Amino acid sequence: MKTLLRPAVSLFVLLTAVTGVVYPLAVTGIAKVTFPEAADGSLIVKDGKTVGSSLIGQNFSDPKYFWGRPSATSPMPYNASSSSGSNQGPLNPALVDAVKVRIEALKAADPDNKLPIPADLVNASASGLDPHISPEAAAYQVTRVAGQRHLLPADVKALVSQHTEGRQWGVFGEPRVNVLQLNIALDSVSK
């Protein structure tokens, strides 16, 4: 029995040290050298204070800000520790009701807006934490944000254009706008 126990415990301790200490430290060290900003969570710092991450959406509900995609995390929106999709199918009555409520909220916030509401403003992303919206979703909100901030819509459109990211490596994905970065830029312009 002792002849089996000693190698088993030794192997357990060795593998725990390698997989629990050495490997994570090595990967973190390599990441900090090769991708220093991303290794720390792509944090956005404004005036010496961390205001969020460029990788995780935030809940903006004030009409003077651009709003991101709805969050699928519960019970608290945009909770990174409970990232998941809603898993509701397109015919699920709960999803249909949620989308109707979101459409009404968008219409109530900007009743004069007659543009079609982009799908990403009423549907959550697969992770429930997407920090981006489409340029169309940003364009839909320009008049509301400009009016709330007493800015010219053309100036707000220009800001949206400046913060529109292209396809990943020019090939993958679609153009997108990071909502947090756009709202930070808006705050800088509005001061």
From Swiss-Prot:
Transmembrane parts of this sequence: 11-31
Subcellular localization, as worded in the UniProt entry: Cell inner membrane
GO cellular component: plasma membrane
Pfam families for the chain: KdpC (PF02669)
Gene Ontology terms for molecular function: ATP binding; P-type potassium transmembrane transporter activity
Lipid bilayer topology: Single-pass membrane protein
InterPro entries xref list: KdpC (IPR003820)
Source organism superkingdom: Bacteria
Keyword flag Nuclease: no
Entry keyword set: ATP-binding, Cell inner membrane, Cell membrane, Ion transport, Membrane, Nucleotide-binding, Potassium, Potassium transport, Transmembrane, Transmembrane helix, Transport
Chief localization: membrane
Coiled-coil intervals: none
PANTHER family attached to this UniProt entry: POTASSIUM-TRANSPORTING ATPASE C CHAIN, POTASSIUM-TRANSPORTING ATPASE KDPC SUBUNIT
HAMAP family assigned to the protein according to its UniProt record, in alphabetical order: KdpC
Oligomer status and interactors: The system is composed of three essential subunits: KdpA, KdpB and KdpC.
Function: Part of the high-affinity ATP-driven potassium transport (or Kdp) system, which catalyzes the hydrolysis of ATP coupled with the electrogenic transport of potassium into the cytoplasm. This subunit acts as a catalytic chaperone that increases the ATP-binding affinity of the ATP-hydrolyzing subunit KdpB by the formation of a transient KdpB/KdpC/ATP ternary complex.
Family the UniProt entry places it in: Belongs to the KdpC family.
Entry protein name: Potassium-transporting ATPase KdpC subunit
Source organism of this protein record: Dechloromonas aromatica (strain RCB)
